[in-house]
Amino acid sequence: MNLFLSRRVWFAAAALCLPVAGQVLKVESIANPSAIGSLQASWSTARDGSPLLSWIETQKDESYTLKYAIRRGTQWSEPRTIAAHRQFFRQPAELPEVISLSDGTLLAHWVESPSEGSEAEFSYVAASHDGLRWTAPVIIHKDRSMVQHGLASIAASGDREASILWLEALQGEDGPVSLKRTVVNAEGKVVKEEALDSDVCACCPTSVVKTARGLLVAYRDRTTQDIRDIAVLRLENGRWSASKNVNPDKWKLNACPTNAAAAAAQGERVAIAWFTGAQNSPRDQIVFSSDAGATFTKPVVVSTGHSFGYTSIALDAQGNALVSWLEQGGAAGARILIRQVSPAGVAGPVIQVAEGSRRSLGYPRILQSGNETWIAWTSSATAAKVQTARLVK
């Protein structure tokens, strides 16, 4: 089911600004090379630190193609194709990603439907050493049954390897859903698959980052009493920590919110932003860690109205976090908002980036690239199109 519905989108620009380390940043719309019909955008950084944007484009035969482009200086590279004529799973939370390993190898992962209209999901990975020629896509999971294997995230976990975190529902919608990790090498081959948590929230995306000590995975856990709070796992010195909640929200929900956590890391610094509906108060919160996720501060609420969640987060060089989320408001019902929060928990002013319907805005993504912070989302005033903007001095 294509969740991207038509709506009017507009951009709030130069008059909106926020202070960062004594300077003023403004929101600036930047054109990108994605075509009409593009959606499900995501960010990473290339080997040299430049912003790398990936997205899906609709083809004339109603299949989809995964593309990416890199912005260096003031110019985008020509869009390059990773995988063409595939049946990508078209759901805002299922974002394909492309990352660079330390040697410049690119790894891409994505989720496909085995057939049109199927709710089953298969997760794939492919690799490229030159950014032009890609290996044949490989399924990252051993199981091939027609169930969920998705909501994946990826991070480099070694010089020539990466870890993909994903969810597996072997018993279908009514059974427990497992959090799993697949290790892939620079050739796009699966090296290892392991289970990390046997019962998590079924339709909430994962988030994985690399800290100075190792991997940190943030996800929405689930207890037998249907408490759905955010938890983290840490991989240090080859061993996984026990699962730990970042905050006891105690959100009880006998359903799946399709809303999880977003994590960002910079050395020992970690910041996590997430949505909760606990106490019948829909809101977005953020916590910080100065010890790679071993401990966290008390949460700071960043949303100011009725939040829909779908958070994204980035950390700047000073340790300030920039958080984006969707909130109720505007003529079409929803707005993309961003806000800076200092490591001390001081929240800056709220900035509106765009407005539209809740579903059609997609899952906005934030990236920190050097001194620049970027955001991507989907607009469809007439047809779906990936939009990008940055915060500039």
Give the role of each language-model region.
Residues 2-11:
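Bacterial N-terminal signal peptides that target proteins for export
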Residues 10-19:
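Bacterial N-terminal signal peptides
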Residues 23-393:
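Extracellular, repeat-based ectodomains that mediate carbohydrate processing or recognition
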